Structures are given as structure tokens and as C-alpha cells.
């Protein structure tokens, strides 16, 4: 039986945050029951996987990243479209952000129901959206792909994959083949 508590209307207590190294280049920013954020530190830049709920929350991720590197945060990957995972993307703009990356089906979800999802999640997760006023609006990808895109962060290969519909129609996973690390978004809980 799963005993983990997930974020909800009744969940108003702060969760302890952990920032754990998974491999040479991969880190996990987690708080029990909250959406997680992946961090990939390449030779020349940083990738964030799932941006948090608000730009204010993103600052907490940035602070942890800055404890281990001063490289620019050039990429934010949206593993799927749920407001609690993506609306913090604008918080990375001052850190060197060049691209917000999502599958094309995720882009379609934002277009079709992004505003509705944002309003619903803000109402359902008050703790995660305490700084709702910091959100400038919907998060739109600047780079989309249909099945797969490969980025090289210096010598580190990063594959961003859309294997098909799962948790949403736009699910994306980030695979580091050299290190055998997979960031799966909400495909696995």
C-alpha cells in the first residue's frame, strides 16, 4: 500500500527538499509528494527537467544547482503539460535560458486546455501556488519535436523522447545513454 502523501488542497505544510546526485551528470530535486525536477549538468550548460509550479519555486531549484555549478541553465524540458510542472519555467530566464523543449503533443495540450489546467491546478494545490502572482502566464515551448530529439551538452548525449501517450498524450522522457539515467516525468510513480 502506498503511504506517500501527494500535494492537494489539504496539503499546506512545507515538504523537506532533497537534492541528490544520481550519476556524474544527473541530479534529482525532490520533495515528498510534490512534482520532482531533474537536473542535467553538461560540459557547457545545464538542463532542467520539469520547471516547478512557479518562478519563485524555480529559484529554490536554481539555488541548489548553483551549489554545484555556475554553468548557464540553457534548457528546460517539459515532460508533459500539467501546470504544477511547467509554470515555473520563466524563473530560469535570467539564468541563460535558450529553449523550453516539449513534444508537439504537449504543445497541442497547452493550446487546447492550458488555461483550464492552470486555473484548476492553482485551485487544487494552494501550497504549490503560494506565489501564483509570479507566474507571467502559460508556459509555451520554444522548441518542439514529434518523436525524438538529441542534444549534445558538450560531450554528454541527451535524448529527449516522446514514446507515445501515457499519463498525457504528450509524455516525454529524458535519457542519458552514457550514464543509463532516465527521467520519466509522471510515466512512473
Spans of features found by a protein language model:
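Solvent-exposed loop/turn segments at secondary-structure junctions
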Residues: 33-36, 46, 53-56, 81-85, ...
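Conserved beta-strand hairpin/beta-sheet module of binuclear metal-dependent hydrolase folds
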Residues: 19-64, 172-186
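Short Gly/Pro-enriched turn/cap motifs at secondary-structure boundaries
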Residues: 17-18, 29-30, 133-136, 140-142, ...
Amino acid at each position: 500500500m502506498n503511504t506517500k502523501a501527494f500535494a492537494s488542497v489539504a496539503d499546506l505544510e512545507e515538504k523537506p527538499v532533497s537534492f541528490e546526485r544520481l550519476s556524474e551528470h544527473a541530479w534529482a530535486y525532490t520533495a515528498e509528494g510534490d512534482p520532482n525536477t531533474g537536473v542535467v549538468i553538461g560540459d557547457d550548460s545545464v538542463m532542467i527537467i520539469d520547471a516547478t509550479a512557479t518562478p519563485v519555486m524555480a529559484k529554490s531549484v536554481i539555488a541548489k544547482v548553483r551549489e554545484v555549478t555556475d554553468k548557464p541553465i540553457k534548457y528546460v524540458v517539459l515532460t508533459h503539460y500539467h501546470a504544477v510542472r511547467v509554470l515555473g519555467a520563466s524563473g530560469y530566464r535570467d539564468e541563460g535560458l535558450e529553449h523550453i523543449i516539449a513534444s508537439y503533443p504537449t504543445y497541442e495540450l497547452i493550446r487546447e486546455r492550458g488555461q483550464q489546467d492552470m486555473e484548476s491546478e492553482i485551485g487544487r494545490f494552494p501550497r504549490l501556488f503560494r506565489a501564483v502572482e509570479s507566474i507571467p502566464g502559460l508556459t509555451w515551448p520554444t522548441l518542439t519535436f514529434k518523436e525524438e530529439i538529441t542534444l549534445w551538452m558538450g560531450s554528454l548525449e541527451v535524448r529527449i523522447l516522446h514514446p507515445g501517450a501515457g499519463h498525457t498524450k504528450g509524455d516525454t522522457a529524458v535519457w542519458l545513454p552514457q550514464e543509463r539515467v532516465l527521467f520519466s516525468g509522471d510515466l512512473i510513480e
